Amino acid sequence: MDMETAYKLARQAIETTYRGIANVYQYGSAVDEHGIQREGETLAMQDVPCKVSFESHDTTSQTETANSLTQKIRLFVAPDCVIDAGSKVEVVQDSTTTNYKSTGQAATYPTHREYELELFNGWA
């Protein structure tokens, strides 16, 4: 089996795990239907198949008296889905809608992209 076929099969396998749909929003100026330039949120991508994954880390050390738990949130999407850092990502997964913010560049693979997310707390 050649690499291209292997990547195609691996991508199909990964995409079978996608349980969510994402809408991606960006903040900036845009011209509305009346030709007026306005600042605000615009829809950049709609109904993107995805999966949100959560990973927790216990950061307790011997000198600390209390446990501290950190959580990494990752978004898995197709390799052709490019999301700018700072974009708002609205995800519907497992009947729950949550708004996140893309925090940086994606880890890009031939089969998918992984974006680190954090909870969205409004536009900066």
Task: Report each predicted region and the residues it spans.
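Short, conserved turn/kink motifs that form compact alpha/beta structural patches or helix kinks used as
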Residues: 1-6, 21, 26-124
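N-terminal helix-cap/turn-to-beta initiation motif at the start of protein domains
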Residues: 13-17
